[in-house]
Amino acid sequence: VKLDEKFTETDRFSSFVRPKFTNKLNKYVKNLTHINEEDLKKASDFVTVLSEFEKFSSGDDTVFLSWSDTDMHVLSENCRQFLSADSADFICKYADLQRYAMKFLKTETKNQVSLSNAAEQFGISNEGLSLHRACDDSRLCAEILQKTYDKRQFAGYIRVLDRKYYRRLMFKPYYVTSQDDPDFDISDFSQNCPHCKKPLSATGKIKHFKNVFTQKYLCKHCNKRYKIHLKIKKTYDGAVKNIRLNELK
C-alpha cells in the first residue's frame, strides 16, 4: 500500500510472482498464505513484477517499510539471482517497522512479535484480512505506523540502503569450531575459583562439541572441580563470546 505524508492510503499494488525453479507449493505455505499453484501459473516472472512495482512505488522521498527485514533479505537474494545485483536500485530508504513498533509494545520478552499479535496489542482488527498475504499485511503495517508515528523517533529507524547495509543484511552469523580461528583465545579459559578466588588449573585438553569448546579445571586450594564452556559466535560486527563456568559434582 502507498501512503501520503498524512498516512492516507493513496494506492495499492498486488501481484504474484511465478516461480522459476519449482511448480509446487508445500502444504505449509498453502495453509499459511492460502495461495495455490493456479495463482502462480497466471503470474509474471520476478523481473517483470519488480519493474511494475518500481513504477508503482518509486519516488525520491519514498521510504519502504516491512514487518522485519526478512522481506528485504528475500528481495536481495532474488535480485542477486535474476538481476546480478544486490538490490532493487529504486529502493533507497527503508525502515524495519517491527523494530520501530516494538518500542511501543508492552512485552516482557525480547523475542520478535508477529504482525497479527502486534496489531491486536494496538487494538487494530484484522477481521476480513488474509494474513500472510502481502497486501493485507501491508494494510496492517500502515495502521500500526499511523498509531505509533513519531517523526523524531521514526527518523532514527530509516536506513539508507548502501553497500554496507546489504553486507550486514546478507551476512550469516556462524559459530567458531576451530582453535585455529583468530578469535579463539586460550586466555578466555583463564578463570578463578568462585569460592576462593584462586586461579584454576586445567586438568584435560580442550574439547569441541556442538559449537561449544569445553575444558575441565581443578581448584588446588579448595579441591573443587569445574568445567568451562566457551561459545564464540561470529557476527557482522565481530565475535561475541559466551563463557560459562559450571561446578562439577
PLM segments and residue spans:
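Conserved non-catalytic scaffold segment of RNase H-like nuclease domains
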Residues: 1-76, 80, 173, 228-249
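Short, hinge-like loop/turn segments at secondary-structure boundaries
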Residues: 82-83, 112
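Acidic two-metal-ion nuclease catalytic site recognized across multiple nuclease folds
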Residues: 144-249
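Conserved beta-strand -> loop -> alpha-helix junction used to position metal-binding or nucleic-acid-contacting
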Residues: 88-102
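Short aromatic/hydrophobic-glycine micro-motifs
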Residues: 35, 84, 123-124, 198, ...
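Acidic, Mg2+-coordinating catalytic module of metal-dependent nucleases/exonucleases
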Residues: 60-70, 74-79, 114-183
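Active-site-proximal helix-loop-helix substrate-binding element of RNase H-like nuclease domains
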Residues: 24-26, 30-33, 37-40, 100-138
